[in-house]
Regions:
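Noncatalytic carbohydrate-binding groove/subsite architecture in carbohydrate-active enzymes
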Residues: 1-35
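Aromatic-rich peripheral "rim/lid" segments of glycoside hydrolase catalytic domains that contact
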Residues: 27-39, 44-53, 57-105
Length: 105
């Protein structure tokens, strides 16, 4: 967090995460960019926890501008769901967490 704030201070610009999100798998916060764990069951609590941690860490900072959710699909009705272990928050409990933070801040 200190390093990110330092970049904001150095350039006198707010920080915007152009992409953020976590898979709904065990240890979703460990190397979250890796997507090679396809044969694992969904862990919706892990996705909730990692997403909440991101919001709690950055969302209230005045130097933070927000971010864009990875991975949001245009076909909402058929995307995600509680058995889906991929990045999308659609039709999963984490979607409500995201809505709450975007509404509040």
């Amino acid at each position: 967090k200190k390093e990110i704030k330092a970049v904001s201070d150095k350039f006198n610009k707010p920080i915007l995460f152009t992409e953020f999100g976590y898979r709904s798998v065990d240890f979703s916060g460990r190397e979250p960019w890796k997507s090679d764990r396809y044969n694992t069951s969904a862990n919706l609590i892990a996705q909730n926890n990692t997403t909440t941690a991101l919001f709690e860490t950055f969302w209230k900072e005045d130097w933070f501008s927000g971010g864009f959710i990875w991975k949001w699909f245009h076909n909402y009705e058929t995307s995600g769901g509680e058995l889906n272990n991929q990045f999308t928050p659609q039709n999963k409990p984490v979607e409500e967490i995201i809505k709450d933070y975007y509404l509040t801040y």
